[in-house]
UniProtKB/Swiss-Prot annotation:
Membrane topology: Multi-pass membrane protein
Family affiliation: Belongs to the KdgT transporter family.
GO MF terms held by the record: 2-keto-3-deoxygluconate:proton symporter activity
Enzymatic reactions: 2-dehydro-3-deoxy-D-gluconate(in) + H(+)(in) = 2-dehydro-3-deoxy-D-gluconate(out) + H(+)(out)
Role summary: Catalyzes the proton-dependent uptake of 2-keto-3-deoxygluconate (KDG) into the cell.
InterPro entries, sorted: 2keto-3dGluconate_permease, 2keto-3dGluconate_permease_sub
Protein name per Swiss-Prot or TrEMBL: 2-keto-3-deoxygluconate permease
GO cellular component: plasma membrane
Segments crossing the lipid bilayer: 10-30, 42-62, 82-102, 109-129, 139-159, 163-183, 201-221, 224-244, 257-277, 288-308
One Pfam assignment: KdgT
Subcellular location per the Swiss-Prot or TrEMBL entry: Cell inner membrane
Gene source species: Xanthomonas oryzae pv. oryzae (strain MAFF 311018)
Keywords per UniProt: Cell inner membrane, Cell membrane, Membrane, Sugar transport, Symport, Transmembrane, Transmembrane helix, Transport
Length: 318
């Protein structure tokens, strides 16, 4: 049976399919973890420890050595995306309930969902698109994008916009696994290669654990909102990223469009933030479902828009 190939036909399928299976498990048997206990409970409820290992392994993949051009390109994209997410948080904070919109076409939409969907780029998708449409420097920009992994950037944005206050030790705790992995990966190339293999392996496991925090009714109710959020991510972050790539990064805008996606790992952000800032707990389930939808929408649309932008750039040069 070609289960893996079938699952991967869906954009982000290795994370989203286990997430849906987890949501199905939680809907049909909410007490499964506590009833089964032991290792089964660890798989069902172990979102944080599984993600901690994943962040460590992601940190190990970040190489310290990078050319000035690569740092310039990646820095302009990463900083622009973070700045846009912060601006969206500042503008929307007075307009949206902290627990999310309760009903209507924007059901579940909250500042937490917006920040989580906008501040983290799908690095794998970006690298693949740049290998096809960009240069080696463009593809190398994924180096700094790995720093967006985890809740740290979202914590900084929510804190800077006045929506939450986090104790200093929480920032340290959020980034420490990434830094430890980063240190080991740069001290020993063999360790970097060893830990890098686990980054893909762990994805379905944290997807399943995350799904076990959701009810299928939440996913159904936020379906339309999730599609709109995915489109909003591309529109709101895409144009600034395109301009930043041209004016700051020295590119033709193609890399900027390719970076206007939502990372699969962003699905974990609402639950992690809610664990540290309880005021976001009511918004977290809907935000998780919304971000999952945004991952699918951006994974489908961003490659198409990147191809169009690359074609326009070639015509302009020609």
């Amino acid at each position: 049976m070609r289960i893996k190939a079938t699952v991967e036909r869906l954009p982000g399928g290795m994370m989203l399919v286990p997430l849906l299976l987890g949501a199905l498990c939680h809907t049909l048997w909410p007490q499964a973890g506590s009833t089964l206990g032991s290792f089964s409970n660890g798989l069902i409820s172990g979102t944080v420890p599984i993600l901690a290992v994943w962040f460590f392994c992601m940190g190990a993949t970040i190489q310290l050595r990078a050319s000035g051009r690569v740092l310039r390109r990646s820095g302009s994209l990463v900083l622009t995306k973070i700045a846009v997410a912060w601006l969206v948080a500042v503008v929307c904070a007075p307009l949206l309930p902290i627990g999310g919109i309760p009903s209507g076409p924007l059901t579940g939409l909250s500042v937490l969902a917006l920040v989580a969907a906008m501040d983290m780029t799908n690095g794998g998708l970006y690298a693949a698109l740049m290998q096809q449409y960009g240069s080696s420097e463009d593809a190398g920009a994924v180096v700094l994008m790995s720093l967006e992994s985890g809740p740290l950037i979202s914590m900084l944005i929510l804190g800077a916009s006045g929506l939450a206050t986090f104790e200093p030790q929480l920032f340290v705790g959020a980034v420490l696994p990434l830094l430890l992995g980063f240190a080991l990966g740069n001290l020993d190339a063999q360790l970097r290669q060893f830990f890098a293999q686990a980054t893909q392996t762990l994805v379905p496991f944290f997807g399943f654990a995350l799904g076990n925090t959701l009810d299928l009714s939440t996913i159904v109710h936020t379906g339309a909102s999730g599609v709109l959020l995915g489109v909003a991510v591309i529109v709101i972050t895409g144009l600034p990223l395109l301009l930043a790539d041209r004016w700051l990064g020295g590119g033709d805008g193609t890399a900027g469009v390719a970076a206007s996606s939502t990372a699969g790992a962003a699905v974990a952000t609402p639950a992690l933030i809610a664990g540290m800032a309880p005021q976001f707990a009511p918004a977290a389930p809907a935000a998780t479902a919304l971000v999952a939808s945004a991952v699918i929408v951006t994974s489908v649309l961003v490659p198409l828009l990147t191809a169009l932008q690359a074609g326009r750039s070639r015509q302009r040069i020609g």
